[in-house]
């Protein structure tokens, strides 16, 4: 399997509970390296751009409001099969359906406040990474 990069967001419900370290430990335990990380407060424009694919969905406004409600930690993760591996580490979007030991099973409050985001494909990862990081901020 090839070395690849994926994008992660530790969402406001997790940062408000000081879970960044616990989530990072699960990421690293899975064999992924955190090659870029920063804590930011997303602007409304950033959140709307990031979630533009959901603009027509009824939950779009609520999602944007949630993502700007507090700090988030944006990350670039690297490793063999990083995209699928991180999606496995995150667990199902609905924490009640997530496997034991996954980030969402352990830490998510609800399907809406599900603690983390991860890219779903290589193309998406590249776009998402570029939205928040310049090349010199990613140190592998």
UniProtKB/Swiss-Prot annotation:
Enzyme Commission no: 2.7.4.6
Principal subcellular localization: cytoplasm
Active-site residues per Swiss-Prot or TrEMBL entry: 117 (pros-phosphohistidine intermediate)
Sites where the protein binds ATP: 11, 59, 87, 93, 104, 114
GO cellular component: a single term: cytoplasm
This protein's UniProt keywords: ATP-binding, Cytoplasm, Kinase, Magnesium, Metal-binding, Nucleotide metabolism, Nucleotide-binding, Phosphoprotein, Transferase
Class of enzymatic activity (EC top level): transferase
Catalytic activity: a 2'-deoxyribonucleoside 5'-diphosphate + ATP = a 2'-deoxyribonucleoside 5'-triphosphate + ADP; a ribonucleoside 5'-diphosphate + ATP = a ribonucleoside 5'-triphosphate + ADP
Gene3D superfamilies, per the entry: Nucleoside diphosphate kinase-like domain
Cofactor(s) it depends on: Mg(2+)
One term of GO molecular function: nucleoside diphosphate kinase activity
Subcellular location: Cytoplasm
GO biological process, one term: CTP biosynthetic process
InterPro entries assigned to the protein according to its UniProt record, in alphabetical order: NDK-like_dom, NDK-like_dom_sf, Nucleoside_diP_kinase
UniProt function note: Major role in the synthesis of nucleoside triphosphates other than ATP. The ATP gamma phosphate is transferred to the NDP beta phosphate via a ping-pong mechanism, using a phosphorylated active-site intermediate.
Family: Belongs to the NDK family.
Subunit note: Homotetramer.
Record's protein name: Nucleoside diphosphate kinase
Native organism: Bradyrhizobium sp. (strain BTAi1 / ATCC BAA-1182)
Gene: ndk
